[in-house]
């Protein structure tokens, strides 16, 4: 991508396209990260992020990608077994992290085409006690959205904490951290927040962080107990990725200006528009293109489009690139038979129309219509 392309050409489901003024904000001089100027910057970031998380709790800022805070969630969950809900590539990663941190982890689910059912979760919770469960709110590999409010209600009846990866949920679809009593919810900078990659943000409930002290082997870099201590001083435990913090402050203010509710609505409209486009495309070209996610569990931020047998999703992605737009290929086991359009972050309906038109043209070319 050339640095001179106009905004509205990059529809990867992460990293997402960043507004020029947000990029520009990173070109500020360094600051000592212990001192008043930094604390002011950090407080500004908190004012931006808290309404996005819908929380009164402080927002931890980790200089890592989102996977870092997934690991932190596992390391800091109170002692006990962990139930991992798997319905896609990223929820599978969460389960792998639990196992690789030496936790007693049980997987429930496994099907990619829908959320893990509450029945299956309840069966598992009845069978034995779990300290926590892991869930991916918006599965970026499939476009499937899980109802984390209902899941949390259920889990809390069994005294099981809920660790939520909302990496492509937060700032694109409603997340009510406080009202839904989420124990820990995390995201990365480079998805629906439309910041460059390199930061992760998370919120822990008071109960979760109080119990985290009992977790042994939390390590150092991802010890949320440390994050909690520093966040109250408007600081981070270690040297933060300062340039990205400048961008976060500016983006938080941009999002406040739009309002989080309007941002959610814009994402809903982008999702609906993309889905209608898929259905019209299928009719027009007479080939089995479809939306992978079930109609009642779609995320607003990304659509995985299934392609008919015999059509190469890779050829579609490459043809779209020749027209000046970036979309995503399939992910994991859906690599060959889906492509993905990331309609999240700061994209507009007009921008989305342009990439969909380029994609339709490409498909007609690939099908030789
Ligand atoms: C992108 C993504 C991640 C991983 O994020 P990194 O920033 O690459 O570590 C985790 N979960 C979901 C749902 C994602 O979309």
Please provide the spans of the model-predicted regions.
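PLP-dependent enzyme catalytic core of the Aspartate aminotransferase-like
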Residues: 3-5, 333, 337-369
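A glycine-/small-polar-enriched, mobile loop at the entrance of the PLP active site in fold-type I
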Residues: 5-63
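Active-site C-terminal subdomain of aminotransferase-like
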Residues: 17-18, 190-276
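Conserved PLP-dependent catalytic core of the aminotransferase class-I/II
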Residues: 44-53, 253-291
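Conserved beta-loop-alpha segment that forms the PLP phosphate-binding cup at the N-terminus of a helix
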Residues: 56-83, 87, 91-95
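Active-site phosphate-binding strand-loop segment of PLP-dependent enzymes
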Residues: 116-171
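Conserved active-site segment immediately N-terminal to the catalytic lysine
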Residues: 178-190
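Conserved PLP-binding catalytic core of the aspartate aminotransferase-like
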Residues: 287-319
């Amino acid at each position: 991508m050339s640095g001179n392309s106009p905004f509205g050409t990059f529809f990867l489901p992460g990293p997402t396209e960043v507004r020029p003024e947000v990029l520009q904000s990173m070109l500020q001089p360094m600051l000592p990260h212990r001192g008043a100027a930094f604390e002011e910057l950090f407080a500004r970031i908190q004012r931006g992020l808290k309404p996005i998380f819908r929380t009164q709790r402080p927002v931890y800022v980790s200089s890592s990608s989102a996977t870092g805070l997934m690991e932190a969630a596992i390391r800091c969950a109170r002692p006990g077994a962990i139930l991992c809900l798997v319905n896609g590539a990223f929820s599978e990663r969460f389960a792998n992290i639990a196992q690789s941190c030496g936790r007693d982890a049980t997987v429930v689910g496994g099907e990619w085409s829908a959320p893990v059912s509450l029945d299956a979760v309840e069966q598992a919770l009845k069978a034995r006690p779990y300290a926590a469960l892991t869930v991916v709110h918006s599965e970026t590999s499939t476009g499937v959205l899980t109802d984390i409010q209902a899941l949390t209600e259920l889990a809390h009846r069994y005294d099981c904490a809920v660790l939520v990866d909302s990496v492509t949920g937060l700032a694109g679809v409603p997340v009510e951290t406080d009202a839904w009593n989420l124990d820990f919810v995390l995201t990365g900078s480079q998805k629906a927040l439309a910041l460059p990659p390199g930061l992760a943000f998370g919120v822990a409930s008071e109960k979760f962080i109080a119990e985290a002290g009992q977790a042994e082997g939390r390590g150092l870099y991802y010890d949320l107990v440390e994050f909690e201590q520093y966040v109250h001083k408007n600081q981070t435990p270690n040297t933060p990725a300062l340039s990205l913090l400048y961008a976060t402050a500016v983006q938080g203010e941009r999002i406040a200006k739009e309002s989080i509710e309007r941002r959610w609505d814009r994402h809903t409209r982008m999702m609906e528009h993309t889905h209608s486009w898929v259905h019209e495309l299928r009719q027009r070209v007479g080939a089995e293109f479809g939306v992978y996610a079930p109609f009642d569990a779609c995320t607003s931020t990304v659509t995985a489009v299934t392609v008919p047998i015999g059509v190469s999703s890779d050829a579609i992605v490459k043809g779209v690139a020749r027209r000046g737009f970036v979309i995503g290929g399939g992910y994991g086991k859906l690599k060959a038979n889906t492509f993905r359009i990331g309609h999240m972050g700061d994209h507009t309906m007009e921008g989305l129309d342009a990439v969909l038109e380029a994609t339709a043209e490409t498909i007609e070319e690939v099908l030789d219509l």
